[in-house]
């Protein structure tokens, strides 16, 4: 088997969104699984729209999710001399030509074609032009597309694709200012980089016949193509920012783990049996672009949150502390190691993201200043207040290093007073945490410690 070489080639005109990252992941997995090469190429030939910040954001996203590329990043803006050489080569071999048609002439031609209900297109009028060029016109360079031929390729996702060259006009490969066009530079770079397999979005499917024309004109080897359907929202519409089409780095800020995001995106358009959770090693062992789905996949926040919660639960306390550093939450330095372990172990089971986990840390460690109204209103204060007063005294005698002792103290109140557990547990929870839900009460008491637990009960009794 020949060396597999893939690439990811974004344009730095905006942030890297999840559709782009998914494409990068597919290319990365295919190359790495086959001990091949994976390159990053920045397609920055549109100098008016390029953004250094966008290019840096792409690199930053790669670093975060752990996609390591081979060699140096290739910037197309540094390769204009190479492109000019190949444009000249095509001109010298009479495979391309200068077209002197003005924009006004081209617009007029298109209007005439529309009036005749024809597809607007350039009519190849300068294809065999031998006369004197008109003055004042900076020409473009067009490729001579072979006529009456069928361009066919077997797409790894779409299957057999055939296009008659008569449907293509002699498309532009160099603008009037000499800058090369997208399809031209992509073809040159893919060929010179030795790209064997191109995995990209199916919005590029219409570009492929044009690129094959160029491959053949330059006697380059044509790579394998895999055109992946786009990601849709759960209503079957194009992704909007609200539905997930946002900067990849925003997911880090929202508290998603890179392992969860990579797993999630790899499953959008690819599957293996009914398995949902994949480590990177499993993805490398199982991924094959031939298994990519031909129908669009749907972005599901529910699925992403479920996966993230799964990965969150499997993080150690030390790993969680590292991951939580970018987020704002209460100081943990007053907790002993055992309390810290209990806090994070309890909360990671109840959190879907790091951001949510940070908020839940605050919910436990910051004393409530108000209490959940609907729960408070249901309390029988004549019964509750004496119970909490009695329990406060028990806590002063309790061993807070032993969770079972704390549990026994709560059970003792319930048994002595001959009441239902909820009649005591609910007001105690409200006193400690300010709301009717949250972590277990023995956990809360253990984490807060004697002094803080007693103080919170006293504050509640004053209300």
From Swiss-Prot:
One of its GO terms (biological process) is glutamyl-tRNA aminoacylation. It catalyses: tRNA(Glu) + L-glutamate + ATP = L-glutamyl-tRNA(Glu) + AMP + diphosphate. It holds the Pfam family Anticodon_2. One of its GO terms (molecular function) is glutamate-tRNA ligase activity. InterPro entries: aa-tRNA-synth_I_cd-bd, aa-tRNA-synth_I_codon-bd_sub2, aa-tRNA-synth_I_CS, aa_tRNA-synth_I_cd-bd_sf, Glu-tRNA-ligase_bac/mito, Glu/Gln-tRNA-synth, Glu/Gln-tRNA-synth_Ib_cat-dom, GluQ/Sye. It comes from the Bacteria. Coiled coil: none annotated. A motif ('HIGH' region) lies at residues 10-20. ATP binds at residue 241. One of its GO terms (cellular component) is cytosol. The keyword Transmembrane helix does not apply. Keywords: Aminoacyl-tRNA synthetase, ATP-binding, Cytoplasm, Ligase, Nucleotide-binding, Protein biosynthesis. It is found in: Cytoplasm. PANTHER family: GLUTAMATE--TRNA LIGASE (PTHR43311), GLUTAMATE--TRNA LIGASE, MITOCHONDRIAL-RELATED (PTHR43311:SF2). Monomer. NCBIfam families: gltX_bact, PRK05710.1-3. Catalyzes the attachment of glutamate to tRNA(Glu) in a two-step reaction: glutamate is first activated by ATP to form Glu-AMP and then transferred to the acceptor end of tRNA(Glu). Belongs to the class-I aminoacyl-tRNA synthetase family. Glutamate--tRNA ligase type 1 subfamily. This is Glutamate--tRNA ligase 1. It comes from Helicobacter pylori (strain ATCC 700392 / 26695) (Campylobacter pylori). The gene is gltX1.
């Amino acid at each position: 088997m020949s060396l597999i070489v893939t690439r990811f080639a974004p344009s730095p005109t905006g942030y890297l969104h999840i559709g782009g990252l998914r494409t990068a992941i597919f290319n990365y997995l295919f190359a790495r699984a086959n001990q091949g090469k994976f390159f990053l190429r920045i397609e920055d030939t549109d100098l008016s729209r390029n953004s250094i910040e966008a290019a840096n954001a792409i690199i930053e996203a790669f670093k975060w999710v752990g996609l390591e590329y081979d060699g140096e990043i290739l910037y197309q803006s540094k390769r204009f001399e190479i492109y000019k050489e190949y444009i000249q080569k095509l001109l010298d071999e009479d495979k391309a030509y200068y077209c002197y048609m003005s924009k006004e002439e081209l617009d007029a031609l298109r209007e005439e074609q529309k009036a005749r209900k024809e597809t607007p297109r350039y009519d190849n009028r300068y294809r065999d032009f031998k006369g004197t060029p008109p003055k004042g016109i900076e020409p473009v360079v067009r490729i001579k597309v072979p006529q009456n031929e069928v361009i066919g390729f077997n797409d790894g996702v779409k299957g057999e694709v055939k296009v008659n060259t008569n449907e293509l006009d002699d498309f532009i490969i160099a603008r009037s200012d000499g800058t090369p066009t997208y399809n031209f530079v992509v073809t040159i770079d893919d060929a010179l980089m030795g790209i064997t397999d191109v995995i990209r979005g199916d919005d590029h499917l219409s570009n492929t016949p044009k690129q094959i024309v160029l491959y053949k004109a330059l006697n380059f080897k044509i790579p394998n193509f895999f055109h992946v359907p786009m990601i849709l929202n759960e209503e079957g519409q194009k992704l909007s920012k609200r539905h997930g089409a946002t900067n990849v780095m925003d997911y880090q800020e929202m508290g998603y783990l890179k392992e969860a995001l990579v797993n999630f995106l790899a499953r959008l358009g690819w599957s293996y049996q009914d398995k949902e959770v994949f480590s990177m090693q499993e993805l490398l062992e199982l991924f094959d672009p031939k298994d990519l789905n031909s129908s669009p996949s749907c972005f599901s926040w529910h699925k992403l949150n479920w996966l993230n919660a799964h990965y969150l639960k499997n993080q150690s306390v030390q790993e969680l502390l590292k991951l939580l550093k970018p987020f704002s939450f209460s100081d943990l330095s007053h907790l002993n190691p055992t309390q810290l372990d209990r806090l994070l172990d309890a909360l990671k089971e109840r959190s879907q993201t790091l951001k949510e986990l940070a908020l839940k840390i605050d919910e436990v460690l910051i004393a409530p200043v108000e209490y959940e109204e609907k729960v408070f209103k249901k309390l029988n204060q004549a019964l509750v207040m004496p119970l909490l007063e009695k329990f406060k005294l028990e806590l002063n005698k309790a061993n807070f290093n032993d969770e079972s002792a704390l549990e026994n103290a709560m059970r003792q109140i319930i048994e002595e007073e001959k009441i239902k557990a909820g009649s005591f547990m609910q007001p105690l929870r409200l006193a400690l945490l300010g709301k009717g839900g949250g972590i277990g009460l023995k956990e809360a008491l253990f984490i807060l410690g004697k002094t803080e637990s007693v103080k919170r009960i006293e504050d509640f009794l004053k209300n």
